[in-house]
Protein backbone atom coordinates (compact mmCIF):
# COMPACT_ATOMS: atom_id res chain seq x y z
CA UNK A 1 0.00 0.00 0.00
CA UNK A 2 1.02 3.61 -0.50
CA UNK A 3 -0.17 4.47 3.02
CA UNK A 4 -0.26 3.02 6.53
CA UNK A 5 -3.35 1.19 7.74
CA UNK A 6 -4.14 4.01 10.16
CA UNK A 7 -3.92 6.71 7.46
CA UNK A 8 -7.49 6.16 6.21
CA UNK A 9 -9.08 6.75 9.62
CA UNK A 10 -11.73 7.68 10.55
CA UNK A 11 -13.35 6.47 7.30
CA UNK A 12 -11.71 3.03 7.47
CA UNK A 13 -10.03 1.88 10.67
CA UNK A 14 -6.56 0.40 10.90
CA UNK A 15 -8.18 -2.67 12.47
CA UNK A 16 -10.42 -3.17 9.43
CA UNK A 17 -7.59 -2.56 6.95
CA UNK A 18 -5.27 -4.99 8.71
CA UNK A 19 -7.85 -7.73 8.14
CA UNK A 20 -8.99 -6.59 4.71
CA UNK A 21 -5.55 -6.06 3.20
CA UNK A 22 -3.41 -8.30 5.37
CA UNK A 23 -5.75 -11.31 5.49
CA UNK A 24 -8.47 -11.18 2.81
CA UNK A 25 -6.47 -9.74 -0.07
CA UNK A 26 -3.46 -11.84 0.86
CA UNK A 27 -5.65 -14.96 0.71
CA UNK A 28 -6.59 -14.13 -2.90
CA UNK A 29 -2.91 -13.75 -3.77
CA UNK A 30 -1.97 -17.02 -2.04
CA UNK A 31 -4.86 -18.90 -3.67
CA UNK A 32 -4.06 -17.39 -7.07
CA UNK A 33 -0.44 -18.52 -6.83
CA UNK A 34 -1.54 -22.00 -5.75
CA UNK A 35 -3.97 -22.16 -8.68
CA UNK A 36 -1.22 -21.16 -11.13
CA UNK A 37 0.98 -23.92 -9.72
CA UNK A 38 -1.83 -26.47 -10.09
CA UNK A 39 -2.48 -25.36 -13.68
CA UNK A 40 1.23 -25.63 -14.48
CA UNK A 41 1.35 -29.16 -13.03
CA UNK A 42 -1.82 -30.17 -14.90
CA UNK A 43 -0.41 -28.72 -18.12
CA UNK A 44 2.80 -30.68 -17.67
CA UNK A 45 0.70 -33.82 -17.17
CA UNK A 46 -1.47 -32.95 -20.18
CA UNK A 47 -4.56 -33.13 -17.90
CA UNK A 48 -7.11 -31.02 -19.78
CA UNK A 49 -9.90 -31.96 -17.36
CA UNK A 50 -7.91 -30.68 -14.35
CA UNK A 51 -7.05 -27.46 -16.19
CA UNK A 52 -10.73 -26.93 -17.00
CA UNK A 53 -11.81 -27.52 -13.39
CA UNK A 54 -9.30 -24.91 -12.17
CA UNK A 55 -10.73 -22.12 -14.34
CA UNK A 56 -13.33 -20.99 -11.79
CA UNK A 57 -10.67 -20.79 -9.05
CA UNK A 58 -8.41 -18.88 -11.42
CA UNK A 59 -11.16 -16.41 -12.35
CA UNK A 60 -12.28 -15.91 -8.73
CA UNK A 61 -8.83 -15.41 -7.22
CA UNK A 62 -7.48 -13.34 -10.10
CA UNK A 63 -10.57 -11.13 -9.86
CA UNK A 64 -10.09 -10.88 -6.10
CA UNK A 65 -6.49 -9.78 -6.53
CA UNK A 66 -7.07 -7.32 -9.39
CA UNK A 67 -10.20 -5.74 -7.87
CA UNK A 68 -8.41 -5.21 -4.55
CA UNK A 69 -5.24 -3.91 -6.20
CA UNK A 70 -7.29 -1.24 -8.01
CA UNK A 71 -9.30 -0.50 -4.84
CA UNK A 72 -6.20 0.12 -2.70
CA UNK A 73 -4.82 2.54 -5.30
CA UNK A 74 -8.23 4.24 -5.42
CA UNK A 75 -7.88 5.26 -1.78
CA UNK A 76 -5.71 7.97 -0.25
CA UNK A 77 -5.45 9.59 3.16
CA UNK A 78 -7.19 12.95 3.44
CA UNK A 79 -3.78 14.52 4.22
CA UNK A 80 -2.57 13.23 0.83
CA UNK A 81 -5.52 14.51 -1.18
CA UNK A 82 -8.05 11.77 -0.54
CA UNK A 83 -11.54 12.98 -1.37
CA UNK A 84 -10.38 16.04 -3.31
CA UNK A 85 -12.20 16.21 -6.64
CA UNK A 86 -10.27 16.98 -9.83
CA UNK A 87 -10.17 20.54 -11.12
CA UNK A 88 -13.38 21.67 -12.83
CA UNK A 89 -11.51 21.96 -16.15
CA UNK A 90 -9.96 18.49 -16.02
CA UNK A 91 -10.87 15.97 -18.74
CA UNK A 92 -12.33 13.59 -16.12
CA UNK A 93 -14.53 16.30 -14.66
CA UNK A 94 -15.77 17.21 -18.13
CA UNK A 95 -16.55 13.55 -18.91
CA UNK A 96 -18.41 13.02 -15.62
CA UNK A 97 -20.40 16.22 -16.05
CA UNK A 98 -21.21 15.33 -19.66
CA UNK A 99 -22.45 11.87 -18.64
CA UNK A 100 -24.11 12.56 -15.26
CA UNK A 101 -24.32 16.34 -14.88
CA UNK A 102 -22.16 16.58 -11.75
CA UNK A 103 -19.98 14.60 -9.40
CA UNK A 104 -22.84 14.63 -6.90
CA UNK A 105 -25.18 12.99 -9.42
CA UNK A 106 -22.50 10.45 -10.37
CA UNK A 107 -21.77 9.52 -6.75
CA UNK A 108 -25.48 9.24 -5.92
CA UNK A 109 -26.08 6.90 -8.86
CA UNK A 110 -22.91 4.90 -8.17
CA UNK A 111 -23.90 4.46 -4.51
CA UNK A 112 -27.50 3.55 -5.31
CA UNK A 113 -26.52 0.92 -7.84
CA UNK A 114 -23.64 -0.47 -5.79
CA UNK A 115 -25.63 -0.62 -2.54
CA UNK A 116 -28.23 -2.71 -4.37
CA UNK A 117 -25.79 -5.53 -5.17
CA UNK A 118 -27.22 -8.65 -3.57
CA UNK A 119 -24.52 -10.35 -1.58
CA UNK A 120 -20.91 -9.45 -2.22
CA UNK A 121 -19.39 -7.55 -5.10
CA UNK A 122 -17.93 -4.39 -6.54
CA UNK A 123 -19.01 -1.06 -7.95
CA UNK A 124 -16.92 -0.09 -10.96
CA UNK A 125 -16.41 3.04 -12.98
CA UNK A 126 -14.78 2.14 -16.27
CA UNK A 127 -13.92 3.78 -19.55
CA UNK A 128 -15.15 1.99 -22.67
CA UNK A 129 -12.50 2.40 -25.37
CA UNK A 130 -14.99 1.41 -28.09
CA UNK A 131 -17.85 3.78 -27.25
CA UNK A 132 -15.39 6.37 -25.84
CA UNK A 133 -17.56 6.82 -22.76
CA UNK A 134 -17.68 6.27 -19.02
CA UNK A 135 -19.70 3.31 -17.77
CA UNK A 136 -20.89 2.06 -14.39
CA UNK A 137 -20.91 -1.61 -13.47
CA UNK A 138 -22.26 -3.55 -10.51
CA UNK A 139 -20.41 -6.83 -10.36
CA UNK A 140 -21.05 -9.80 -8.10
CA UNK A 141 -18.40 -11.74 -6.22
CA UNK A 142 -14.94 -11.09 -7.74
CA UNK A 143 -16.17 -10.57 -11.28
CA UNK A 144 -14.79 -7.92 -13.58
CA UNK A 145 -16.36 -6.55 -16.77
CA UNK A 146 -16.31 -9.16 -19.52
CA UNK A 147 -15.28 -6.75 -22.24
CA UNK A 148 -11.63 -6.18 -23.03
CA UNK A 149 -12.58 -2.65 -24.09
CA UNK A 150 -13.23 -1.58 -20.47
CA UNK A 151 -10.41 0.22 -18.65
CA UNK A 152 -10.92 0.24 -14.86
CA UNK A 153 -10.89 3.72 -13.36
CA UNK A 154 -12.44 3.22 -9.92
CA UNK A 155 -13.56 0.23 -7.86
CA UNK A 156 -15.39 0.20 -4.56
CA UNK A 157 -15.48 -3.05 -2.61
CA UNK A 158 -18.86 -3.98 -1.14
CA UNK A 159 -17.94 -7.38 0.21
CA UNK A 160 -18.85 -7.28 3.90
CA UNK A 161 -15.19 -7.65 4.88
CA UNK A 162 -14.58 -4.21 3.31
CA UNK A 163 -16.78 -2.38 5.80
CA UNK A 164 -18.42 -4.64 8.40
CA UNK A 165 -15.95 -4.09 11.26
CA UNK A 166 -16.54 -0.32 11.02
CA UNK A 167 -20.08 0.01 9.62
CA UNK A 168 -21.70 -3.34 10.50
CA UNK A 169 -24.63 -3.87 8.10
CA UNK A 170 -24.77 -0.23 6.97
CA UNK A 171 -23.44 -0.61 3.44
CA UNK A 172 -25.00 2.71 2.28
CA UNK A 173 -23.23 4.59 5.11
CA UNK A 174 -19.90 3.03 4.11
CA UNK A 175 -20.54 4.02 0.49
CA UNK A 176 -21.25 7.60 1.55
CA UNK A 177 -18.13 7.82 3.70
CA UNK A 178 -15.64 6.13 1.37
CA UNK A 179 -15.76 9.06 -1.09
CA UNK A 180 -13.93 11.12 1.57
CA UNK A 181 -10.82 9.06 0.83
CA UNK A 182 -11.15 8.38 -2.90
CA UNK A 183 -7.87 9.08 -4.66
CA UNK A 184 -9.24 11.14 -7.55
CA UNK A 185 -5.71 11.83 -8.80
CA UNK A 186 -5.31 8.10 -9.45
CA UNK A 187 -8.75 7.87 -11.07
CA UNK A 188 -7.93 10.81 -13.33
CA UNK A 189 -4.50 9.37 -14.18
CA UNK A 190 -6.16 6.14 -15.33
CA UNK A 191 -8.72 8.11 -17.31
CA UNK A 192 -6.04 10.13 -19.11
CA UNK A 193 -4.15 6.93 -19.96
CA UNK A 194 -7.36 5.34 -21.24
CA UNK A 195 -8.26 8.18 -23.60
CA UNK A 196 -4.77 8.42 -25.17
UniProtKB/Swiss-Prot annotation:
Enzyme class (EC, first level): oxidoreductase
Superkingdom, natural source: Eukaryota
Name of one Pfam family that matches: Sod_Fe_C
GO cellular component: mitochondrion
Cofactor, free-text remark: Binds 1 Fe cation per subunit.
Enzyme Commission no: 1.15.1.1
Binding site for Fe cation: 20, 68, 157, 161
Cofactor annotation: Fe cation
Keyword line: Iron, Metal-binding, Oxidoreductase
Catalytic activity: 2 superoxide + 2 H(+) = H2O2 + O2
Family the UniProt entry places it in: Belongs to the iron/manganese superoxide dismutase family.
Function statement: Destroys superoxide anion radicals which are normally produced within the cells and which are toxic to biological systems.
Self-association and partners: Homotetramer.
Protein known as: Superoxide dismutase [Fe]
